[in-house]
Amino acid sequence: MVYIAVAGGSGMVGQEIIDALVAKGKHQIVLLSRKDAPKETLPDGVKWTKTTYDVAHLVEVLRGVDTVLSFVAGPADPTNKAREDTQKNLIDAAIQAGVRRFAPSEWASAGFDHMFWYNYKSDIRNYLIEVNKDKKVLEYTLFQPGIFTNYLTYPFKSAKRIQQLGLPFNYHERHAVIVDGHEDAKITLTTVQDLARIVAVAVEHEEEWPRVSGMNGGNLTIRQVIELGEKVRGGPFTVEKLKAEDVKAGVLKTSRVSKATHPSIPEEEREAAAPVLMAGILMGFSSGVFEVSDEWNRLLPDYKFTQPEDFLTKAWAEIDAGATEVSIEV
């Protein structure tokens, strides 16, 4: 049994991982939230604690906790420091309370070039280095799955909790937008189901966590992502190629801009945010920041990660047969 605290667990990724931890049937889990506890009965072994994320209160809550998993998210606004401050308080409290392990709110890319909304992740990486510079006071790891393979079934769900997000690759419409000349940049694709299962194993891992916890369902070039789409969808894609200088300047000369549907973005801001976010993602793909390492593939050589082609072939076969949600089990 591991005593785990989860911060920001009401989000999509957090809920997927909580489900995997609960499925183990042996962990004690405390969910930290600014909100009141839901009316629904929580699963066995799970309790809800309302907090302002004040350090003194967190210290009391975290006493006896072995591992803190953070999924803190918020507005895609580089001037908003709430996410950064919340995680710094979590880190400070974890150290004071004697917590052994901490996983900050990562859950995506290896780097953050061109994606200003991830600046807080970089700041927290630096803060963790700072607090451990004289001696190790808190073991931590950066869980990085790359892009969820599930997003390539958009707009059809292929996971219990994850809300589908539009990418520049739209398998449903057989359409892609890319940055010209960067077709060979690599992207790591990993299912959210694999991520959840690996985290559920990682909290029980007796050896020290690696500093970076990359996991890898498959590395595909941008060209290969499109070719795979053409294969599983049974037809050619329309591919729009944009000039890098235009994309960097925020000018998207394309007929289609992916919708900004992430829950952290207020509905009234989504139309304005969409081209900004798409430009950042396009440049992020092109610069290779979504190609992540494979530490957990190597630590767990017997674990069979779901290959993108296998997942997407089964998923799109169901969708093409009339399914509105993918019942695929991986």
PLM feature spans:
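Oxidoreductase cofactor-interface core, primarily capturing Rossmann-like NAD(P)-dependent enzymes
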Residues: V2-L42, V55, A97, A110-P236
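Structural motif
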Residues: Y3, D66-T67, R101
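NAD(P)H-binding glycine-rich loop region in Rossmannoid oxidoreductase-like domains
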Residues: L31, D36-A97, S109-G111
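Short, amphipathic alpha-helical "lid/cap" segments that border enzyme active or binding sites
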Residues: I91, V192-A200, F305-T313
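Short, glycine-/small-residue-enriched flexible loop/hinge segments at domain edges that mediate gating
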Residues: F102-A110
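A conserved mid-domain beta-alpha-beta active-site/ligand-binding segment of alpha/beta enzyme cores
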Residues: A185-A196, A273-S286, P301
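Terminal hydrophobic/aromatic helix or amphipathic segment near a protein terminus
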Residues: S213, I226-V289
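Amphipathic terminal alpha-helices
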Residues: S293-V330
